[in-house]
Amino acid sequence: MFHATSPAVPPSATLRVRRYAELHGWNLLVAGTGEFSDARYRANPVDRCYFCKSNLYDRIRSMIQGTIASGTNTDDLADYRPGLTAAGERAIVHPLVDAGIDKSTVRAIARKYGLHDLAELPAQPCLASRVETGIAIDAGDLAFVDRMENSLAPIVGLQTPLRCRITRRGIVIEVSAEHVDNSNLREGATRLCAEMKRSLVDIRAYERGSAFVGKPSVVSAPDHA
């Protein structure tokens, strides 16, 4: 099993996977993938994920021989995933897709094997996904996003979708609709932004992938269209 570290990966995610690997005896490789050395990635085009996954898979290939399998599931094929193009170019296999397994089934499998906190873990796309297309990816910005989300999540509940977006207008907090008018959330977000010299411009209903501007509807991997 390979886990990538970079400024785009929340430190809590790395701690979690290390803890599980130690507990269950997984053969875990942890390494940086170097996407921040790639100017194409940092420029944050709409297909940024293509350059991220290209660096990721090339890094894994430099460390191991044999087949590389991703954790892509069938639900991922219905979303904009330029990283799947990078996977197809490198003959990465997608066993969950081949088996017709979607995200809910992955969660059910985790429950069956006693991995209950993983089964209930909210979706955690990389921190770079919070940055609006065309705004350069900066490690300091991603650390800010991580701090904001970790600080605000307890206010609305850890299972509630919450995103800190970096937009051209300023900082936007997205949260499930029932929490948009939460006064404690607004107070906390305003205070944190002021502490970090950022401008909070809006708290609005969560919209998946809203930071991607100009994205096509679907990008599927070769052999899995």
Q: Where would I find each of the regions flagged by the language model?
A:
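ATP-dependent adenylation/nucleotidyltransferase module used to activate substrates
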Residues: M1-K112, I171, G188-S199, E207-A225
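A short, flexible beta-alpha/helix-coil linker loop
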Residues: F36-S37, E132-G134, E178
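Mid-to-C-terminal catalytic subdomains of enzymes
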Residues: V97, I101, R107-R163, A205
